[in-house]
Amino acid sequence: MYWEHAYNFWVKVYALTFALGVVSGITMSFQFGTNWPGFMERTGNIAGPLLGYEVLTAFFLEASFLGIMLFGKQRVSNRTHLISTFLVAFGTSLSAFWILALNSWMHTPAGYEIRDGQFFAESWAAIIFNPSFPYRLTHMMLASLLTSAFLVAGVCAYRIQKGVDGPATKMVLKSGIYTAALVIPLQILAGDLHGLNTLEHQPAKVAAMEGIWETQKGAGFTIVGIPDEEARETRFAVKIPNAASLILTHELDGEVKGLHDFCLLYTSDAADEV
């Protein structure tokens, strides 16, 4: 009884967030053509099918069963309604799968060849399950679950404070807290593995994110600062000593490659190509 009462409240919240997701998703689809036409012109043979898979397998699944979940409780059996609810959740997760597959491929492209300036698929398995995809998908799914847990816990705590729906709200509050307690250590582990994967495949990006200009051992973690590209330094930087090396290499004196070395490397490679 309590769970049903909680469901009737939270399904309304889900319906609102789903509507916002649809609106923002449609806008994003148009942005691929309006903001990045050059990118789509060259990678459309890969990006287009991945976006199409998301619509055909995920969005249609969500849209088909969302109506039953929202409005069919009194019109279908409890089992059918339960299955519809789980299928909507599965469709949402499947949507994240395809979107993050494309996003990850943009970071760590694989399974393609370039002909006449166009990207063509050689292996869809390699494209979808590219080097950063498992880490990014796990990290994002855990982040979504953690965000939901804190949202649920926060709203329930507010409702309890206002004296609304005591027993049911307390039960859901506990579930939110327990979920967060379970997911937090998993997210820390997933985030660490994702960071190590990024360091392996995109070390220049890591150096840029951390504001590490020169290759160094015992690199500090910059909390705040103002990057100066001409001087190649971060002015007024507030750092935690050795923290960047500890996070990225798991050693206090681990070596982290700096942006200056990448500039020299890429400049040298470009000169060799010319």
Task: Specify the residue positions occupied by each region the protein language model found.
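Short aromatic-rich membrane-water interface segments that cap or initiate transmembrane helices
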Residues: 42-53, 121-140, 268
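Functional transmembrane-helix hotspots
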Residues: 30, 34-38, 99-116, 192-209
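Internal alpha-helical transmembrane segments
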Residues: 67-75, 80-86, 97-105, 128, ...
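Membrane-interface helix-loop-helix modules in multi-pass inner-membrane proteins
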Residues: 17-87, 104
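Membrane-interface helix-loop junction between the first two transmembrane segments
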Residues: 1-6, 35-36, 161
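Conserved small/polar residues in nucleotide/adenosyl-binding loops
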Residues: 266-273
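Aromatic-rich transmembrane-lumenal/periplasmic boundary elements in polytopic membrane proteins
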Residues: 102, 179-249
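Membrane-interface interhelical connector segments
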Residues: 252-265
